[in-house]
C-alpha cells in the first residue's frame, strides 16, 4: 500500500470510531442514550470552548482591548445570529442572494428584513409639518386657507390656475 491508501484507511478508521458510538446508541438501545453524546449547539459553550474563550479574553486585555462582548459560540458569533437585509431587496434575496448568503454563512442564522426607506418617510413627515404649520398660521391670523385672491397654484399633474378665476359664480 502506498501512503495515500494509509491516510485514507486511517481517516476512515477515525470516522468509523467516531460514529460507532452514535450508531450503537441509536440502533441497539434507542431508549438508552449516553449523556456524553449530545447535539452540537454553537450557542452553548463546552469546557474546551470556555478555556479558549478565557485565553482569548486574556490576550485581548493584554492588547488593551477591554470590550465585554459576552459569551460567544462557534466562530465568535453571538447567538442567536440575525442577518439584516433591507425590504427593498426582498425580491432580489428570494431570487438570488438568500441561498448564497445562508450557504456561505458558517453558523445557523435567521434573516430579518428592515424598512430601509426611512429617508422618504422623514421627508413626508417634514412636508406634513410644513402644511400643518402653514394652515395653523392661516387660521390664527384669520386668513382663508386658500391663500390670497389672485394667487397662482398648481394641481399635481395639471396646469397652473388662477384662484380669482374660480371664485366667481359656478
Swiss-Prot record:
Keywords: Developmental protein, Nucleus, Repressor, Transcription, Transcription regulation. It comes from Xenopus tropicalis (Western clawed frog). Residues 79-114 are annotated as: Ripply homology domain. Acts as a transcriptional corepressor. Negative regulator of the transcriptional activity of tbx1 that plays a key role in pharyngeal development. Plays a role in the formation of the anteroposterior (AP) axis during embryonic development; required to establish the posterolateral border of the pre-placodal ectoderm (PPE) acting downstream of the retinoic acid receptor (RAR) signaling. Belongs to the ripply family. Residues 143-152 have a biased composition (Polar residues). It holds the Pfam family Ripply. This is Protein ripply3.
Amino acid at each position: 500500500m502506498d501512503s495515500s491508501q494509509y491516510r485514507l484507511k486511517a481517516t476512515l478508521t477515525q470516522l468509523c470510531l467516531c460514529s460507532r458510538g452514535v450508531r450503537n446508541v441509536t440502533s441497539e438501545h434507542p431508549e438508552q442514550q449516553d449523556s456524553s453524546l449530545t447535539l452540537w449547539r454553537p450557542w452553548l459553550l463546552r469546557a474546551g470552548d470556555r478555556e479558549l474563550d478565557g485565553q482569548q479574553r486574556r490576550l485581548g486585555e493584554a492588547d488593551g482591548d477591554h470590550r465585554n462582548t459576552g459569551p460567544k459560540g462557534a466562530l465568535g458569533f453571538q447567538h442567536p445570529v440575525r442577518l439584516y437585509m433591507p425590504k427593498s431587496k426582498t425580491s432580489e434575496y428570494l431570487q438570488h442572494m438568500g441561498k448564497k448568503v445562508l450557504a456561505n454563512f458558517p453558523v445557523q442564522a435567521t434573516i430579518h428584513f428592515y424598512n430601509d426607506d426611512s429617508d422618504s418617510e422623514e421627508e413626508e413627515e417634514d412636508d406634513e409639518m410644513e402644511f400643518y404649520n402653514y394652515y395653523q398660521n392661516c387660521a390664527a391670523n384669520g386668513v382663508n386657507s386658500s391663500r390670497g385672491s389672485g394667487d397662482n397654484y398648481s394641481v399635481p399633474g395639471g396646469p397652473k390656475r388662477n384662484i380669482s378665476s374660480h371664485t366667481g359664480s359656478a
